[in-house]
Amino acid sequence: MRTGGAPRIHGELLKLGFDVSERSVARYLRRVPRRGDPATRWSAFLANHREAIVACDFFTVPTLTFQLLSCFFVIEHHRRKILHFNVTREPTPAWVVQQLRDVFPGDGPYRFMLFDHDSTFDGHVTGFMKATGLDPTRTGIQAPWQNGIAERWVRSCRRELLDSIIALNERHLSRLIRAYVAYLLTPVSTKLSQLRCRDIL
């Protein structure tokens, strides 16, 4: 009705037999609060709660024999730290619940868990999240920007690791990602010294 404006709404009310002035209609229209841009609201939510937000997601990795493996991970928003990851051939809701149980054995400092509309995140998974004190928060459909921290980590993992090495199997992929996560946790000063030593050699 906002697109019609006061004159049109006034005309419709007259047709229905309501005798009100156009000025009264305009006055009440101005009182309707306008909702902000969805992107702005979501950004504000992420900024206000970043220390209490964790996100989980899947990404697929083909192996040397063209099998598809699914890598599940949980990432902390504030420090962009991987809290947990695991690899499987067939992810199921029960498997995801077990992964979350490994990460969140009890009440923790986190309040919100972001995840997309993957069918694996069903009622059992969201029920477990609620039981551990997490508020399950689904992102919009086809809106990867709403879980940008997780999507960025996947992109970095592909670019810096998986685009250069082909995983042989499930165990090999787990070992590769474990080494990559350990590398990311290495202090920057140590990484720089390693680079300098490599340049000297």
Where are these regions (language model features)?
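Charged DNA-binding/catalytic regions of mobile-element recombinases
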Residues: 1-201
